Amino acid sequence: MKIVFTGGGTGGHVIPNLAIIAAVKKLAGHAQIFYLGSQDGLERKLAEKTGIEFYAIQTGKLRRYFDWQNAVDALRVPVGIVQALHRLIKIKPQVVFSKGGFVSVPVALAAALLRIPLIIHESDLSPGLATRLTARFAKKICLSFPTTHPGHKIQITGNPVRPIGSAEHGREFLDFGNDLPIVLIAGGSTGAVFLNLLLERSVFALAHKTNVVWLTGAGKLPKMDLPENVRLFDYLDQEYLDVLAAADLVVSRAGANALFEIAAASRPSVLIPLPAESSRGDQVENAKFFEKAGATMVMPQEKAKPHDFAKLVIWLLSDSARLAKIGAAAKNLAPSDAAERIAKIILDAAK
């Protein structure tokens, strides 16, 4: 049995794929796994690191705004489709699984042209552009959030996440040497410019009362002297899961994968979603869903001033009962078997 995975651009599209691949291998150890993605994307690095056979194709980013690069990327998509067709014809997979992102579109369309069963997964509450372009060709559409538009293709699976880390290992890795609570601020695999600027202006106030773990995003480390109880990283791979488990509070954007990894670890959080005017509004919708369930606290970006932000974080960390309640509510939103559910759907489609 041969299965092709695709999806990339950010960790939110790649990391769930790795969780699903692990579940597929557990259920069907004989399955051959292949990954089609971009030449320079995070998906190549992570796929090859885990021993997955990877093939690069041309991809074009799907922007919703005017940019001269749109014309160049528009030419890359058909080239990517041809490359994906060539690769799929050679591999002859029984099924293709798409996790979304602009990287996935050429592969999903090539699968449709070759009549290979296509399974897709949408993490966000509202579907992204890649999902909207390819959903009509899918045999099954897996969703992380409940939907008000059920159909025969729809399967509510939850969001696949990596195994929960060890808080003990996380504390050993961070080596703070004190009993202060730990706050983890993470802007995702590519970083969040606003969160980094916010931390530059509030990290000293936070460090008086908390231990701070600051994930800036790859290549975005600030050039500044920091208190000794601040740990600065541009990116963490497997260590992130242990650090997440060790955190007393997490501050994050509201991308679905980040949200569900926080929830799976029962961590309370403060979400600062990417504003709707800077995106399609998916993070705002994700954050509102979690907030309505009592599973987070939301601080809109326009209200996230350094003093107010530090004050909120320190106040929350002083209320252990509130933190426990938020963490428990978050855990209820994250099915522990999402990766296995999706793996079974993929394997059924491959029969």
Which residue ranges define each predicted feature?
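A short, well-ordered alpha-helix in the C-terminal region of glycosyltransferases
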Residues: R322-S336
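Acidic donor-binding loop of glycosyltransferase active sites
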Residues: P93-V95, A245-F260, R267-P268
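Structural loop-to-beta junction motif characteristic of Rossmann-like glycosyltransferase folds
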Residues: I52, I116-P117, D248-L249, S266-L274, ...
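Active-site-proximal region of nucleotide-activated glycan assembly enzymes
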Residues: A112-E168
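Glycosyltransferases and closely related glycan-assembly transferases
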Residues: Q83-V96, V105-I119, R132-F137
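Donor-nucleotide binding loops and adjacent catalytic segments primarily
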Residues: G41, L46, T50, H169, ...
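Conserved nucleotide-sugar phosphate-binding/catalytic loop shared by glycosyltransferases and other
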Residues: I3-G8, H30-R76, Q83, T157, ...
